Structure formats: C-alpha cells, structure tokens
Swiss-Prot record:
Taxonomic lineage from the root: Bacteria, Pseudomonadati, Pseudomonadota, Betaproteobacteria, Burkholderiales
Keyword Cytoplasm appears in the UniProt entry: yes
Membrane topology summary: Peripheral membrane protein
Localization terms from the record: Cell inner membrane; Cytoplasm
Family: Belongs to the SecA family.
SMART domains: SecA_DEAD, SecA_PP_bind
Source organism (scientific name): Paraburkholderia phymatum (strain DSM 17167 / CIP 108236 / LMG 21445 / STM815) (Burkholderia phymatum)
InterPro entries: Helicase_ATP-bd, Helicase_C-like, P-loop_NTPase, SEC_C_motif, SecA, SecA_CS, SecA_DEAD, SecA_motor_DEAD
GO CC annotation terms, alphabetical: cell envelope Sec protein transport complex; cytosol; plasma membrane
Catalytic activity: ATP + H2O + cellular proteinSide 1 = ADP + phosphate + cellular proteinSide 2
Complexes and interactors: Monomer and homodimer. Part of the essential Sec protein translocation apparatus which comprises SecA, SecYEG and auxiliary proteins SecDF-YajC and YidC.
Cofactor note: May bind 1 zinc ion per subunit.
Protein name (Swiss-Prot/TrEMBL): Protein translocase subunit SecA
Cofactor(s) for this UniProt protein: Zn(2+)
Amino acid sequence: MTTGFLQKIFGSRNQRLVKQYQKTVAAINALEPQIEQLTDDQLRAKTTEFRQRVSSGESLDKLLPEAFAVCREASKRVLKMRHFDVQLIGGMVLHYGKIAEMRTGEGKTLVATLPVYLNALSGRGVHVVTVNDYLAQRDAEWMARLYNFLGMSVGINLSQMDHGLKQEAYAADITYGTNNEFGFDYLRDNMVYETDARVQRTLNFAVVDEVDSILIDEARTPLIISGQAEDHTELYVRMNALPPLLDRQIGEEKADGTGVEKPGDYTLDEKARQVFLTESGHEKAERLLAEWGLIGEGESLYAPQNITLMHHVYAALRAHTLFYKDQHYVVQNGEVVIVDEFTGRLMAGRRWSDGLHQAVEAKEHVKIQSENQTLASITFQNYFRMYAKLSGMTGTADTEAYEFNEIYGLETVVIPTNRPPKRIDKQDQIYKTAMERYNAVIRDIRDCYDRGQPVLVGTTSIENSELLSQLLNKAGLPHEVLNAKQHAREAAIVAEAGRPKRITIATNMAGRGTDIVLGGNAEKQAAFIEADLSIPEEEKAPRIQKLHDEWQTLHDQVKAAGGLHIIGTERHESRRIDNQLRGRAGRQGDPGSSRFYLSLEDPLLRIFAGDRVRAIMDRLKMPEGEAIEAGIVTRSIESAQRKVEARNFDIRKQLLEYDDVSNDQRKVIYQQRNELLEAHDITETIGAMRHGVITDIVRQFVPAGSIEEQWDVPELEEALRNDWQLDLAIQEMINESQSIDPDEILEAVLAAADEAYESKVEQVGRESFSAFERSVMLQTLDRSWREHLAALDHLRQGIHLRGYAQKNPKQEYKREAFELFAAMLDSVKLEVTRIVMNVQIQSPEQLEQAAEQMEEQGSHLENVEFRHADYSEGGAAVAAAPVAANAAAAMIGDAMAHGGSAAAPFSGDAVPKVGRNDPCPCGSGKKYKQCHGKIA
C-alpha cells in the first residue's frame, strides 16, 4: 500500500528513467538544426572527429547526444527515416546496457543503429545478434547503407561461411550474426592450434534482438560441438520393437497401494517429460530382452553390465510416448528434424542428446546417425555474460524482467509507444473439446473474411496448423499457411498478411522479424520494381506512385474493417509468446483486435488447470458448442502459465548453477590454451611439469623424511627405466654414500631427467622441439578436456540422488567436479611429460612432421556437429550415454594410477547383483528400484 502511494508521488522506476532520458532527447533535438546544415562529407567527417575524441579519453556517455544527432541525420539522408523521440530513448537504454521493451512496429532495427554507431567509435567492435541468418543478412544489408555513409565497416557472420570471410566479418566495426554462430565461433576459437586461426576479437558490446527468445527461451539449451562416438545403430533398431509391446499405466501408485486406475508397464510424467517403467514393466522388458538374446535368462536389467541396455530402453520409450511427429519434429529428406517449440521453426542440424534422437530415427524408420561425444560446450548465459557490455530489445520482456535482472544483471525499461495503442484484447473463450474450439475459430474467421478484415491465426504446432488448414479448405476459405515447412516463403507471406480478406495461419510468431502492415507491404513491391531491369527507368516512378495510391486505398479499407484480427488457437506455456502473437496487431497506433480460443483438451489446461475449469463447466451445465468467457477462467489460465514460467525459470537457474562449475573450469582451460598459443617458448612450463611429475614418482617409492628401510629402490629404478627412459643406479649411489637422504635421491633423479631432456633438445634445436612440445600439450589438453566434459555429464546425471543421503546435490557436484578437474590436470601433466621424455628422435624433419600430424588430428575431427542439447530432454531417469560413462571411468582410473584421489573405476564384475526390491547399496534405506536403480 505504501509502495503504491509513493509511486503515485514519485512515479515508478521505469517512469523516472524515461523522464531522465527525455532530458537527453531535448539536447539531441537541439543539435538537429546545426547538424542539418552539414554537407554529406562534413557529416561523414564527424565519425573521424568522434573517434579521435574517444581515443583522447572522452567517454562515450559524454559523446552520446552528438553521436545520436549525427546518426539520426545520416538515417534521414540515406534511409529516408528519422528516429522518433521514443526511438532515441530506446537507443539510450541499449547504450547503458539495459533491455528496451518496444512494441511491434516501433522500429527496433532502426533503434539499434544509435547505440551500435556510438559504441563502434571505440574501435573494439560491436555485435548485433539476431535469431536467424535471414534476419542477420536482411538487417545488415539494410543498415549497412547508413553505417557505410558514416564511414563504418559492416560484416555479416553466417553459418557455413568460409574461415577468411569470418575473420573479415569480425574485423569490421559492426558485425551482424546469429546467437548460435557467435557462440560456436567462440568455442571453435578455443579449439584452434594457431593464433591466426581465431576469428573473434575481444567480446566488447552486444545488442541482442529478440532478447527474450535468445536469453530465456534458448537458455536451457547449451551450444555443443560434438564428434562421433561408438556406434549402437543395431541396438536402437532392436529396442524400437519394445515400446509397442508395453501398456501405459493410468494413475500413480500411492503408499497404501491405491491410486492406479489402470495397471500397466510404464507411467508418464508429462510435466517433467519423463517416463518410468513399473514393476510389471521391468519384468516384461526383461522377459522380452531375454527372448531376443540381449540379456541372459533370469538376468536383471539393473545388473551393471546391462546399464547400456537400460539407457536404450528408456530412450525408445521416450521416443514413442513423449515425442510426436509434426509437433516435436518432422521427417524431411529421410532425416528427423527438430521443430523449435518456441518459434515453430525447423532446427536443421540440431540433435537431441542421450540417444533420444537415434531412438526417434529408429521409430520413424530412417537412417540412424551415430551418437556423439561432446568436444566443447557453453550455455548462452555464460557466453553472453562474457561481453563487457550487453543489451537487448524485444516486444515482450516485462513478464521476464525479474529473470533478466537475476541472471544477467540487465534492467528492463518499457519504452512508450510513438502513438497510443488501439488494439482491443477480447476475453478468452473456452470450449470442452478441441473440435468445438475449431468450429468457433472458423466462424470468427468467416465473419472477418465477410467484412474484409485480415486475420492472423496462431497455432502452437505444425500439426494444428495443418488441421486448421484442412478445416478452412472444407469451409471454402482461401488462406496461407506459414509454418516451419515453408521457411523460405516466410517473409513474403507475413508481408502480405495485412491485405483485406487475407487469412494467414502461422505457428508461433516469435522471431518472424517482418512487420504486418495494414493493406500489404507496398515498400517491398516498390523495391521489386526498382530492381527489375526489364522496366524502363522513366516508367518506374509512375508505377511506384500508382502502387502507393492502391496501397493507401487498401490501408483505409482494412482500418475501417477493424485492422488486423489475431486469433490464438491455444495458450502457450509462456504468457510472453501469447503477447508476441497479440503484438502483431495494432502497430504504430493502427486499430486491431485479438482473442484466444481454448479447449479443455489443450496440454496447458489439461495438465495445469483442467479440473478447475471443467468443474465450472459442469456446474454451469454448458451445452455442446457453448463457451465459457469469464475473467475468473482467464485468470486461472494465467495463473497456470505463471506456474510453468516459474518452473522453467528454476530449471534455467539450476542449469546455470551447474554450468557455472564447468564454466569456471572452461575459463582456466581456455586461458591456458591461449597462453600456450601465444607463448614463443614453453620450456619453463614443460620443465615445471617434468619436475612435478618426477617428484611424485620418486616420493611414491622414497617418501620425504623417511628412513632407508622404508624405501623401495628396485621398484623406483624399474619405474624410471620403463616409464621415463632413465637408467639410474640408485642402489649403487646409496651403497657408496653413508648418509644419503630422500632429498638427495630426488635431486639426482631430477638432474638425470633434465640431462636426458637437454640431449633431445640438442638433437633437433630449441625451436623445433618447442613447437613439438606445444603440439603435444595442446593435443593432450584438448583430449583430456573432452573426456572431462563427458565425465561431468555422467556425474550430473545421477547427482540428484545424493539428496536421498541428506546431502546437497549442488555442493556434492561442485566438490566432485573439482576433484575430477584436479585429476584431469594431473593426468595432462603426466601424459605430456611421458610423451616428451619418451619421444625417439631420428631427425628435426621427423619431429616437425609429428607435430603437424598431431595438430591435423586435433583440428580436423570427423563428423563434427554443432547443436543444442536440452538438459530436460536427457532426463534424470535415463542412464548416462555409455561414452560418458566409459570416459569418466577411464579418467578416474587414470587419476588413481597416477596417485590421484578419485574413486576406483567402475567394474561390472566387482559389483554383486542387486535385486529391484533389495535395499539400495548407497545406504539411503530405500529400495534399489526407488533409488539408484532409477538412473540405471
């Protein structure tokens, strides 16, 4: 109550910020008459002047009014577009490292030019981040005219681009590209073997377009560069036959044995997107697998040797029960292509992790691609937080303002619209069944069509858009379908969606990037006339004028009919996606309207709010075809959406907390890599490693401060001879000296190791040997890091079970991840020292050849893929991929062999068979099937 009272007096934080920025707007406007007097050359020369002032120490903040005024004047001359005052405010918000929420049609692309121009003056580069290649190319080509006029260079960073072109793009003052490509380039730069092979400069300033889509929707999906692992194709094919033979159980068994409506072999948790085998399901699966010869007769699926099989069983089950064709994926050209659930776009080249993608391929009977091993990965949260300054813009950020502030430290500022909005948002209508809902949608569309009003219908899946298309065909209503399958026609369809009587069906409109102008997009058609060489120059101007006159007539006609009408056929999990769909109508003060039509069969209502709404309908005795239209129901749905959003926020926050552990380690590894690449001579580093490793070896057999009776000299001599090519008569030294101590023995061994090393260097020369050492070091570091990533994945899969032992899973993960990391660094030192000490040199040329070969192997990995992998897809109930388990076991085993403190490697033979109903060996007191058996 007090807060509301104070806000009335002082205004909200948002209002105060906007008011503050309006003072700067007045200063920019005051400069306009003076800037208008400048010639083109004088205006261009301002950039050189600004650059000199920045290099002399003047701050960008002080330069802002002049730079914005110059940029606005250049835009007027080149693009024939003048920044509105609210756009200047948007530009300031971006410059100060905040998020600008601007409604659709308010000119976000033009707003970005202001802070981009200002920050590019520093010469440290600016990245403009978009959601897809089409928008990156469109915006770069469109705005390059403005930047080039002002003497700025512009680069476009696209996927599949040549390495040289990428370096040019990053060297430019301003670089446009997609979030994925910027992230992958960062990872690739940390896998190179030469400094000049890197493409990125220091991460200085980024403006992220559709910031909510990139920093929130995609934040659960780390960027992963992966290579091919072990082939299990045959096993996926065999397992694909299992799910159809199992029945779903309805209801969860409670402690008293009640709760099961229909017994079955597996249960589904649709909220968590998980599937679990029941007791009878395990028995049936074991029986079938034994019949197929995949496990021994009477053998348990929980036996250690069957963990891989368990992984495949769950992958097949999830593929059949939780992932549907034309909703979660499409089959195109013999491949399973993921559909982005937020935007409805096809995610070509992206694959689900943990064997799920292969299981879906087996289900759809297409060629099964091999499983992958992670080579490098990073989340968007950790990538974008590396920029010295980060900002973003979107039409819908206010609902996620807390998350932006909590995770990225970004404040959200809502920018006032240039003209007051006139869109009317009508109450939701809720029907009992999906068919009743679609009939109501068709009636609404027909009403709009009859009065010449354009309609945009939003659906949440490709399947629903195609079903609606069939119903419209039956009703005889002409329409356009815009979904992931028509990606190439996307912009053209959206541009014309504002014409009279136009009906457009679209999957989620997030990131579509093209404005819907009432009456159609005359500018695009005018551009086609300008570019058409077959039309004589003197005819072009009259044709374009005629086009604009026709457009004005259509524009007025559509405005009179009520503007663009938005129909939502389902509520999305996120209110923001619904708001994005609504935001397509009512741009720049145009009229418009929106309404959502829902049914109790929609996933959101069914899972989160269905019982409450159904009870209201039953109480009101609603006849078939009748809808509920009440504020209480709409609020109930919004409450369900808030619950889902809160849950998704927790998932993203938890992902970040876990990823922060590997991120700290990633920084250490990448920093070491960069130091190695830039160092001319790493002799000191190698020497320190050699001394450390040799000291550890000697101390194993001759401990510090010990007496002669405790020494194992024969074993030490053998270890030095076999592993390190050092033939030392230590026993003779002891016999000859009456008072030799452990430190003297250590010094003698270190001196011998140094001498052996120097003799190798003398054979080929310091420069050649140093190049070889660098190659060995990089190759070993990269291989160990890849194995370490797999080990962390494996550790993460089952860490939540520590909660059963009253331990904090996050703390346990941090502790064990650190132990694994320390063991990895020890194994790197050991491996590098071993190779350097054991290398047999015939000639300098041979050494150079070996170094080149190692670099070649490291930089040209087979079948490398660049993808997202959603951690929620892998699921805690599914076993870690075999490759992760094997790599983890191998690494822990290495650490033990070299004196590390990690646990002994897992061995199937050493573990006794545990029955499903036996107490879990971890000591939690639970049955094995309810504890560690769950992740098997």
